[in-house]
A protein has these predicted regions:
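Membrane-interface micro-motifs in multi-pass membrane enzymes
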Residues: 109, 115-118, 208-213, 308-309, ...
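Short alpha-helical interface patches
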Residues: 109, 117-126, 138, 215-225, ...
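Alpha-helix initiation and N-capping motif
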Residues: 118-121, 185, 210-214, 237, ...
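Transmembrane and membrane-interface helices of multi-pass
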Residues: 2-207
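Short hydrophobic "helix-edge" motifs at membrane interfaces and signal-peptide entry regions
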Residues: 72-73, 258-260, 479-481
């Protein structure tokens, strides 16, 4: 399509004016489109024009950096497809989708969209049922309408043509610039410093809110690589191994002689005690079994690294003894880091002659469990397909079915059994009326109708979870095989958008997580755990314990020999029982936003041990006489094999 002429002028003059006008339009579009896209992206996340404009005017240099990144993406897409309008439309669609995903993640679990979320292809579909509210659908519809209008401009706007060589060179420059932003090349570091960029790695919601989505997302690319701790070296690990050998010695001497109980870990989906909510009452006790065990048995509270989701990260901490605190915020080890055998509780018990079995009542591919469990040394993995005609409650297999599978697994083995079971029934969201209107436990208190419905649905599931625990206890009370059950939730449930139930009840004072006190942060990450056994064990109360220290604690209670790394965990937990990225709790119960100086050296050793095992040279195995990483997880070279019908 030719540029239109201008009447009353000679043809050559009209053509020249038209070209000048067209060139001006191109320049304006190349500058204006990225600015508008950044404003739109931030508007999606911030919710109002006022909040977006306030951020823009207070942080105009950050706004310009976000626009520069979007400009590079826009030009790169143009270099690929060669159409200005199509590039604008595709850029708008792509970046709007990223903004929407980040918006929903923040609303539901308090985390923005990270670079590594791109690789959660199947898992990402799990968010679809969560975005069907009217407000969400309006946002999605509006975005697609705007993109459609942009594409319509193709009918009137002439095609901007550049020679293929020019497009290749320009595209390569864009890729180089984006890569430089991702790895923070020196020239980018200088640019960011001059703009006053403050990367808030310990609080990613604040990081995105302050720096803008495009810039924060790009800065997180470099965090996909876990850096080597400054003090990590073979001499350092050899010295640490020597002290660990001294710890392991007494532990071995105190180990229970010859008794090998069945050890059953049950991580119940989103299990939490709803009676902890203030200003809310229930028609009956929703979790009587857990409340009874809190009085009769060892119990306490686990400090979870997650809220509302990210179940596999809790598994990672419990099964390996490693901490999410030393990995990039928002990362998923099951997807990103575990691609080879790694020592775990499964391989530990397998080495003692146990059958190590994993059970999960959902898809085996979810969070890459099928592969990860093999690397951890599980002998078998029963996923959703391994359940024979199971009962469903709502959309998911009932927790009772998991309890029955646990019993069947133990009964079918001649050797003692280690089981790690993960339930699914009470997965959120809870505004779906999955059980109909007949909720056995009624809720009263300072909640609106929507929040009350959400809480009643959740409580129904928590009640079923509690009942499924009692089913196991009833069975193993009659068993002659010594058995211990460790029952806990992976994280608190996401009870509505913006922590709705928690805010309305007064459990927290605001939906803005970056404004929570340390006490509120602790409450929002503390889940109850209980232990039960059919043999005598002294009762203990545990005020706080990180998930990464749970395995070492259980082995201590069983008086079983601990691997060197878990021996260190046991000692560290006496000084720092609670360790999250932005919350540290010491042995006196004092809360800190970061590791106190008195424990910094000990925590750094923990970081070095984790790096050595996951990414380093496995010096610890060399100097403690422990099996190598591969042998620890797969001592016979077989790995995990699915049960019949399982994954």
């Amino acid at each position: 399509m030719r540029p239109l002429g201008v009447q009353g002028q000679p043809k050559s003059s009209r053509s020249k004016l038209a070209r000048m006008g067209w060139n001006s339009f191109i320049v304006a579009a190349m500058i204006g489109i990225p600015l508008l896209l950044v404003f739109g992206m931030e508007l999606i996340g911030r919710g109002t024009v006022h909040e977006t404009w306030t951020w823009l005017t207070a942080n105009w240099k950050l706004f310009e950096l976000n626009a520069l990144i979007v400009f590079l993406v826009f030009v790169l897409i143009y270099c690929i497809i060669g159409s200005l309008v199509m590039s604008a439309g595709i850029s708008a669609l792509l970046l709007s989708i990223v903004s929407l995903i980040s918006y929903f993640k923040v609303k539901l679990i308090g985390e923005p969209f990270f670079p590594w979320d791109i690789f959660l292809n199947k898992e990402s579909m799990n968010i679809l049922p969560l975005v069907t509210t009217r407000t969400a659908l309006v946002r999605i519809g509006l975005i697609f309408a705007i993109v459609a209008v942009i594409f319509l401009f193709r009918l009137w706007v002439p095609r901007l043509s550049l020679r293929p060589v020019t497009r290749v060179v320009l595209g390569a420059l864009c890729i180089f610039a984006l890569y430089s932003f991702g790895v923070r090349a020196p020239w980018v570091g200088t640019l960011l410093d001059r703009a006053g960029v403050n990367e808030i790695v310990w609080n990613q919601q604040e990081n995105y809110g302050t720096n803008g989505l495009s810039l924060a997302f790009t800065m997180n690319v470099k965090n996909t690589i876990v850096p080597k701790p400054p003090g990590y070296s073979e001499p350092t690990m050899a010295s640490l191994a020597e002290s660990l050998n001294e710890m392991v010695g007494p532990s071995t001497a105190n180990a229970a002689s010859g008794v090998k109980p069945n050890v059953i870990f049950i991580m119940n989906e989103a299990f939490w005690d709803p009676t902890l909510l203030p200003n809310v009452s229930f028609s009956e006790d929703p979790v009587p079994t857990v409340h009874r065990l809190q009085q009769e048995s060892t119990s306490g509270y686990l400090l979870s690294p997650q809220f509302g989701g990210g179940t596999s990260n809790v598994e990672f901490e419990v099964l390996t003894g490693q901490s999410m605190s030393f990995l990039p915020a928002g990362s998923v080890p099951y997807q990103q880091y575990i691609s080879k055998p790694i020592p775990s509780m499964a391989s530990y018990f397998k080495g003692l002659g146990y059958k190590s079995a994993a059970i999960h009542s959902y898809e085996g591919w979810f969070w890459n469990r099928e592969n990860v469990y093999k690397h951890m040394g599980f002998d078998s993995f029963q996923s959703k397909d391994g359940f024979q005609n199971p009962e469903y409650r709502g959309d998911f297999i009932a927790d009772d079915e998991v309890s029955k599978s646990i019993i069947k697994e133990v009964e079918s083995n001649d050797n003692p059994t280690f089981i790690y079971a993960v339930t699914m029934q009470n997965h959120g969201p809870y505004d779906d009326h999955r059980y109909g209107s007949d909720n056995p436990v009624k809720v009263q208190g300072s909640l609106d109708d929507a929040a009350r419905d959400t809480l009643e649905t959740y409580v129904h599931g928590a009640r079923d979870a509690d009942s499924s625990l009692q089913l196991l206890i009833d069975h193993f009370q009659k068993s002659n095989e010594p058995t211990i059950i460790v029952f806990y939730g992976d994280h608190l449930p996401m009870l509505g958008y913006d922590y709705d139930v928690y805010v309305q009840s007064g459990f927290i004072h605001t939906a803005k997580s970056d404004q929570w006190s340390l006490e509120e942060l602790k409450k929002m990450h503390s889940v109850p755990f209980v232990m039960w056994s059919n043999f005598d064990m002294a009762k203990e109360q545990v005020p706080v314990l990180s998930n990464s220290f749970l395995s070492a604690y259980v082995l201590d209670r069983l008086q079983m020999e601990k691997p060197a790394a878990l021996a260190y965990n046991a000692e560290l937990s006496k000084k720092i029982p609670g360790l999250l990225r932005n919350l540290v709790i010491d042995s006196d119960g004092q809360m800190h936003a970061s590791v106190p100086a008195s424990a910094a050296a000990d925590v750094e050793k923990y970081r070095e041990l984790q790096y050595d095992e996951m990414f380093g040279k496995q010096y610890l195995a060399k100097y403690t006489g422990a099996p190598s990483t591969a042998a620890a997880a797969d001592p016979e070279g077989g790995g995990a094999v699915p049960n019949a019908g399982g994954h």
